[in-house]
Amino acid sequence: MSAVLARPDPTDAAARIRTLAREAGFQRCGITGIELGEDEAHLRSWLAEGLYGTMHWMAQHGDKRSRPQELVPGTLRVLSVGMDYGRKDDTEAWDTLHDGRRAYVARYALGRDYHKLMRNRLQKLAERIQAEVGPFGYRVFVDSAPVLERALARNAGLGWIGKHTCLIDRGGGSWFFLGEIYLDLPLPIDTPATAHCGTCTRCIDICPTQAIIAPHRLDARRCIAYLTIEHDGAIPEDMRKPIGNRIFGCDDCQLICPWNKFAQRTDEPDFRARNDLDVATLPQLFAWDEAEFLRRTEGSPIRRSGHERWLRNIAVGLGNAPGSEDVLAALESRRHDDSALVREHVGWALAQHGL
């Protein structure tokens, strides 16, 4: 008869899990329970106001998003982890934003898509935990299911939810990705993080489109990240000028946050900028045909936007750029593009230059 290994003491198991998480490449981790009552009420209110735009999946799945035990029956605890993606400094980001000919791509999207990388590491982490504590039920998530990941991360002690709705770690800023493992292990839980924004409103004040309509209240319909990534139609005209040269996402509310002076700079090779996206100009990127777009965005989160939206976004950026010869030539090259969506945005951009 084979021997049955006794489960380790829950406190010892939790400590070992944290060690394994850090060995797996996660710079922060914590364990929390599954109670999200206040966050459920906040989510319901946000949905009722229609602030989610066309992201209809936010309203799907009922209360499973805020009730882990309904999404994955048997769940008792959630292991929340964070992986840094901060770059060497913020100067380069501000320099790009202030140079109208250059294209600004949100920092998280400059390198490899984090979803697959983190999911693989979380899966391996779960397997290592099983090898040490014995079989248990679990499910891994990386922005891939209805999960209130920031609320869970806050409760697990990883940081607090800032007024811009991003998670902030007092000792590491906000430049990090989140992932979770739902567990059926009765582990001791960590202390939730407390807020330290105080009276600061820098993120609210700097938002180019005034999308942060109140502390902890984001109107996605005005958010540049939503407009350039999630929204699949025409960008509202009153939003186009404020978008500036931001062609995929926006980081302003994080760049201005004082806590990011403590942000940890990643040494993860997969998060390094690809295809010179951190220095590319708008005309250069506008010249990509669909085949080149697909080739250069392989393994990148940018691919999910599709070539048409990519061109739509860059057209807006070109409309806001200084009217140099190459900017105008780039726009003229797509005046008669096959896509009506692209043509409309190119027409708007040309009009900004008096053409």
UniProtKB/Swiss-Prot annotation:
Ranges of residues in domain 4Fe-4S ferredoxin-type: 185-217
Cofactor(s) annotated in UniProt: cob(II)alamin; [4Fe-4S] cluster
Protein family: Belongs to the QueG family.
Keywords on record: 4Fe-4S, Cytoplasm, Iron, Iron-sulfur, Metal-binding, Oxidoreductase, Queuosine biosynthesis, tRNA processing
Organism the protein comes from: Xanthomonas campestris pv. campestris (strain ATCC 33913 / DSM 3586 / NCPPB 528 / LMG 568 / P 25)
Chain sites annotated for binding [4Fe-4S] cluster 2: 207, 223, 250, 253
EC number: 1.17.99.6
Function: Catalyzes the conversion of epoxyqueuosine (oQ) to queuosine (Q), which is a hypermodified base found in the wobble positions of tRNA(Asp), tRNA(Asn), tRNA(His) and tRNA(Tyr).
PROSITE patterns in UniProt: 4FE4S_FER_1, 4FE4S_FER_2
Compartments (UniProt record): Cytoplasm
Database matches in InterPro entries: 4Fe4S_Fe-S-bd, 4Fe4S_Fe_S_CS, QueG, QueG_DUF1730
Record GO cellular component, one term: cytoplasm
Note describing how the cofactor binds: Binds 2 [4Fe-4S] clusters per monomer.
HAMAP family: QueG
Pathway assigned in UniProt: tRNA modification; tRNA-queuosine biosynthesis
Transmembrane segments: none
Primary enzyme class: oxidoreductase
GO biological process: queuosine biosynthetic process; tRNA modification
Keyword tRNA processing on entry: yes
Descriptive protein name: Epoxyqueuosine reductase
GO MF annotation terms: 4 iron, 4 sulfur cluster binding; epoxyqueuosine reductase activity; metal ion binding
Quaternary data: Monomer.
Record-linked PANTHER family: EPOXYQUEUOSINE REDUCTASE
Gene it is expressed from: queG
